[in-house]
UniProtKB/Swiss-Prot annotation:
The keyword Flavoprotein does not apply. Its main location: membrane. The lineage of its organism: Bacteria, Pseudomonadati, Pseudomonadota, Gammaproteobacteria, Thiotrichales. Keywords: Cell inner membrane, Cell membrane, Membrane, NAD, Quinone, Translocase, Transport, Ubiquinone. It comes from Francisella tularensis subsp. holarctica (strain FTNF002-00 / FTA). This is NADH-quinone oxidoreductase subunit C. The gene is nuoC.
Length: 216
């Protein structure tokens, strides 16, 4: 793939700025990405990027859960008829612990240098996954970090107001985790006798209707 001279120039300059840290970088599909090895360096590295390469805007923070990465919901058998693949056989869904299950991703924009980069870091597995908040660097981080906490259960140290932002305050679990059931845990309805909304355990069976199949 041909990389533009300007993009390559930005990549080399930023790589030089981050040379003292455990960071790996690449240019892929016309985008610059840097991977941080140690999550304890996230705040310092992002602060350095903002100050020394004028990344004055944080456009997004998100995360990825790799718990079931590379696993199929169904195991597809060999072709046994003219109609195509044999019937899918449902298999036990494995949710065994994986190393560095979660990855956090930051999208940065420098309007002064007209360049965007992606900075990501695999997070160490722990009962409480904790990352330093960057809301002191970019006010825009406040709500997107709350969203990551709400959806993935990743906590942000020194965040000014780490509360759920998309789900109810009494919500159980984190919906974008791979081990969160698609049906959820509770459902709500309006109870005419009580005159209010009530929560009840879901009565829907959690099953795979459109399976993810990986054919190698």
């Amino acid at each position: 793939m041909i990389v533009s001279t300007k993009l390559q120039d930005h990549f080399e300059k930023i790589t030089k700025i981050l040379s003292g840290f455990g960071v790996e970088g690449c240019i892929s599909y016309g985008e610059i990405t840097f991977s941080i090895r140690d999550q304890r360096d996230i705040h310092l590295i992002l602060k350095k990027l903002k100050k020394e390469y004028l990344f004055e805007q944080l456009t997004d923070v998100t995360a990825v859960d790799y718990l079931t990465y590379g696993q199929s919901d169904w195991q597809v058998g060999k072709v046994v008829s003219q109609t195509g693949f044999s019937r899918g056989r449902q298999q036990d869904f494995k949710t065994a612990a994986v190393d560095n299950r979660f990855e956090i991703i930051y999208q940065l924009l420098s309007m002064a240098n007209n360049v965007r980069i992606r900075v990501k870091c695999k997070l160490k597995d722990a009962q409480i996954i904790l990352v330093d908040s960057v809301s002191d660097l970019w006010p825009s981080a406040n709500w997107v970090e709350r969203e990551v906490y709400d959806m993935f259960g990743i906590y942000f140290n020194n965040h000014p107001d780490l509360r759920r932002v998309l789900t109810d305050y009494g919500f159980v679990g984190h919906p974008l985790r791979k081990d969160f059931p698609q049906t959820g845990y509770v459902e709500m309805r309006y109870d005419e006798n009580l005159g209010r909304v009530v929560y009840e355990p879901v009565e829907i069976d959690d099953r795979v209707n459109t399976p993810r199949v990986i054919r190698n």
